[in-house]
Amino acid sequence: MESECLTPEWASQPCLMGIDEAGRGPVLGPMVYGCMYCPISYQSSLASLHFADSKTLKEEKREELYESLKLDKSLGWAVDVIDPRELSAKMLAKNKTNLNEISHNSAMGLIKRVLDMGVLLTEAYLDTVGDPDKYRIKLSERFPSIKFVVSKKADSLFPIVSGASIVAKVTRDRALKEWLVEETGEDINRNFGSGYPGDPETKAWLVQHKHSVFGFPSLVRFSWGTCTTHLKGEVEVAWEADENEESGNGSSSKRQAKLSSFGFKTCEKRSEEIESSGKGRCKFLQARKIQQLTQF
């Protein structure tokens, strides 16, 4: 999580905060939550800063506003950049965390971060994720000393949220431009468009960078349905854990979803046609349930 490092001089004054996100829908790249906060006494001046919903602004204007708010001594800000691998891991885990809960946790993490800096937050405005009333109650139970306003289109209604929207959007855009691609053995280009599943440029990028065994580069969110569609018909993989459950060896009534549910095609060969996972195999392979496939 990144933020302005120093506690502002006005931290002991009653303050308000706005929170918004960028990158919730795209199939690739991080999801970013951003916040902006200031003394309530400065609230009337926010309108003169010309903040607006970041989606309605051109990139040049967003960058200009972002740099100006960073220089404003009456404003504080912080961001939480959630890696696409973290999103996929949480959403595909045995005990899944859905995207709404991930979003809620990120927003609450920002609030806690600013409170821990010694800022006296008394009001917070957020764009809703899920049901507004339920979200507001959840926030109020966690932070009873803060008055919460949770609303649809909050980034258009409240300048403090508009500022947070700009912080989140610019941070995500810069993160994508500077993203360090770990899969150095592949010829990966950065012409991935907006990252939204419906974007033709994004679709073409996914097709171009799809691997028949490993799927996609780590920039991609494997938990998105778009990935499931793209991975259908690729190399079949036999998962020993799935075979054990099909044989009735699973002890839990609530079993983990099979990897085949997420686009990884399961091999139809029975376990006896594959190298045995028992006697004769080294302990390293046995412990990790790694099997040799004789053919693809």
Swiss-Prot record:
Function: Catalytic subunit of RNase HII, an endonuclease that specifically degrades the RNA of RNA:DNA hybrids. Participates in DNA replication, possibly by mediating the removal of lagging-strand Okazaki fragment RNA primers during DNA replication. Mediates the excision of single ribonucleotides from DNA:RNA duplexes.
Coiled-coil ranges from the UniProt annotation: none
Family to which the UniProt record says this protein belongs: Belongs to the RNase HII family. Eukaryotic subfamily.
Domain RNase H type-2: 14-236
Disulfide cysteine pairs (residue numbers): none
Record's keyword terms, sorted: Endonuclease, Hydrolase, Metal-binding, Nuclease
Binding of a divalent metal cation, residues: D20, E21, D127
GO terms (BP aspect): RNA metabolic process
NCBIfam families: ribonuclease HII
Database matches in CDD domains: RNase_HII_eukaryota_like
Record bears the keyword Nuclease: yes
Cross-referenced Pfam families: RNase_HII
Cited InterPro entries: RNase_H2_suA (IPR004649), RNase_HII/HIII (IPR001352), RNase_HII/HIII_dom (IPR024567), RNase_HII_hlx-loop-hlx_cap_dom (IPR023160), RNaseH-like_sf (IPR012337), RNaseH_sf (IPR036397)
E.C. no: 3.1.26.4
Superkingdom, natural source: Eukaryota
Molecular function (Gene Ontology), one example: metal ion binding
Cofactor binding summary note: Manganese or magnesium. Binds 1 divalent metal ion per monomer in the absence of substrate. May bind a second metal ion after substrate binding.
The organism of origin for this protein: Arabidopsis thaliana
Protein name per the record: Ribonuclease H2 subunit A
Reactions performed catalytically: Endonucleolytic cleavage to 5'-phosphomonoester
Cofactor(s) essential for the protein: Mn(2+); Mg(2+)
